[in-house]
Amino acid sequence: MTQANNAVYTDISAAQLVEEAIRRGEGELAANGSLVVRTGHRTGRSPVDRFIVEEPSTKDAIAWGNINRPFPADKFDALWARVEAFNNAQDHFVSHVHVGSAEAYYLPVKMTTATAWQNLFGRCLFIEPEQYNPAGKDEWQVLNVANFECVPERDGTNSDGCVILNFAQKKVLIAGMRYAGEMKKAMFSVQNFLLPERDVLPMHCAANIGEAGDVTLFFGLSGTGKTTLSADESRYLIGDDEHGWGEGVVFNVEGGCYAKCIDLSEKNEPVIWKAIKFGAVLENVVLDEERVPNYADDSLTQNSRAAYPLEHVEKRSEKNLGGEPNAVIFLTCDLTGVLPPVSILNNEQAAYHFLSGYTALVGSTEMGSGGGIKSTFSTCFGAPFFPRPAGVYAELLIKRIKAFGSKVYLVNTGWTGGGYGVGKRFNIPTTRGVIAAIQSGALIGAETEHLEIINLDVPKAVPGVETNLLNPRNTWADKAAYDEAAKGLAKQFIENFKKFEVSDAIKAAGPQL
């Protein structure tokens, strides 16, 4: 709307941001109307470059370590001033957005970026409110200057780029980072620290809502199927990645989606396909001579992405929120082929598997993990984004599940009939069949079979899913090899779980040898 003399573009429209990005050579238009950009040598998040300022409010509240690295307050002040002065000497872009769709829990954010495209990205992913900050809350500031190069010896950073959260000053500093996912996840981490103080569980999950108002949550790491499975043409999307669960409400922290694009097809993912149009941003997607995206081309990265506002999704929850969840689904991509396509969990098992967060890094979003696919345990299905000790989030989850009576399921979107390289991955229609059965209530009170070693209960029948797939041992040609693989996986679970101090009932809910 306004443009000052010193080329500060404040709250200009998405169309103007696209225009500015192209004028400045930041990207190009694809045939489908989206803005296509490249993020340079960083095509994923850089966990080693992320810090939290250590000060009285964070000192004893954060699980410090490799994920949450402390940063000195004085160094932060010096670096913020340096980056801000650098940015003030060039054209830049400012937008005012909200993070958190529920009125009680939103954060007002002044987002300043050096590039037009990253501002557009923020406008896609965060919430553009009808009225900015109606409750007059204290404002957060995000300063994202991609062309600033940090000097580790001077600035105290790990490399030429950094992401630093300062809770005392309500500031997020992002410097030297072209991969825009850093901005989205930084504000997610902020809410993940703040929401538990309000008795709200922050979650790395997708959420959708049925015609009858029933809500389903999909927890999972990148690449396990959150975005794909929640984008269901028969249901209304609340969001694909970040939510809060408070008394009586599940709300989106964001106002957009950040979908993986590798091998995207109109047939398997029609909702996402249609959402990629003018106003959307494609990161590291290769175009052909006609400017048509080639989603199968992974020459830049496996982690190619599309950012688009929820307005691009036809069937969506108008207010970005819904009631409490009837079904809570933990998505795991099991490389070993040991886990069943669906297991029904009790409360103790829910706590165990939430804390474990077992899955695979598939086309990982983290730098340097491009080549192989490997198994991992990521607490709360999103360890990089949860600053407090894991127990805080697990206790809140169990409290919410018990209070509302949500049913919890573990769904394997990974391998069956053998491990990675031997078996085959469950196809999307099979997993959609499992999800549909869960959402219809068909598995509530279903007859189950207990699987020893991995200590899970599987339904004996799931409408629309081949019965021989339900017990994974049946899908292996070599049953002895399955038993060995199950023992190997159980050992990994037990070893990983040693770090948690929890009740014996929760410990006993996991795999047993």
UniProtKB/Swiss-Prot annotation:
Keywords: ATP-binding, Cytoplasm, Decarboxylase, Gluconeogenesis, Lyase, Manganese, Metal-binding, Nucleotide-binding
Cofactor note: Binds 1 Mn(2+) ion per subunit.
Gene Ontology CC, one term: cytosol
Domain of life of the organism encoding this protein: Bacteria
Major localization listed first in the record, in broad terms: cytoplasm
UniProt key word Lyase: yes
Reactions it catalyzes: oxaloacetate + ATP = phosphoenolpyruvate + ADP + CO2
Family annotation (InterPro entries): PEP_carboxykinase_ATP, PEP_carboxykinase_C, PEP_carboxykinase_N, PEPCK_ATP_CS
GO MF terms held by the record: ATP binding; metal ion binding; phosphoenolpyruvate carboxykinase (ATP) activity
Stored Pfam families: PEPCK_ATP
Binding-site residues for Mn(2+), renumbered to this chain: K185, H204, D241
Binding-site residues for substrate, renumbered to this chain: R45, Y179, K185, R305
Family (UniProt): Belongs to the phosphoenolpyruvate carboxykinase (ATP) family.
Quaternary context: Monomer.
Protein's name in the database: Phosphoenolpyruvate carboxykinase (ATP)
Species of origin: Pseudomonas aeruginosa (strain ATCC 15692 / DSM 22644 / CIP 104116 / JCM 14847 / LMG 12228 / 1C / PRS 101 / PAO1)
Gene: pckA
